[in-house]
């Protein structure tokens, strides 16, 4: 009787671990993590048109390649 109980417990553990491995675990959304992404320089961002060059008009620091906005993009 004890052997049967142990066998049933082992079978239950194996089935539960198999269900977790197949994807029955957590269902939370995974964030995209870019570990190997290359960070671009300000010049590369400007060249590709992703940001505004210095002395051009701006409304927020995110628009400027240097992230310094005072009505126009500044170098410092």
Swiss-Prot record:
Tissue expression remark: Expressed by the venom duct.
Disulfide bonds: 51-65, 58-69, 64-73
Keywords of the record: Cleavage on pair of basic residues, Disulfide bond, Knottin, Neurotoxin, Secreted, Signal, Toxin
Pro-piece positions: 20-37
Protein biosynthesis as UniProt keyword: no
GO cellular component: extracellular region
Major localization listed first in the record, in broad terms: secreted
InterPro entries xref list: Conotoxin
Ranges that cross the membrane: none
Cellular localization per UniProt: Secreted
Signal sequence region: 1-19
GO MF, any single term: ion channel inhibitor activity
Domain remarks: The presence of a 'disulfide through disulfide knot' structurally defines this protein as a knottin.
Family label: Belongs to the conotoxin O2 superfamily.
Record-given protein name: Conotoxin VnMEKL-021
């Amino acid at each position: 009787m004890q052997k049967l109980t142990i066998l049933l417990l082992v079978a239950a553990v194996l089935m539960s671990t198999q269900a977790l491995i197949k994807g029955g675990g957590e269902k939370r959304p995974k964030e995209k993590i870019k570990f190997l992404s290359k960070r671009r320089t300000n010049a590369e961002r400007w060249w590709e048109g992703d940001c505004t060059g210095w002395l051009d008009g701006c409304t927020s620091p995110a628009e400027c390649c240097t992230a310094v906005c005072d009505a126009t993009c500044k170098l410092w």
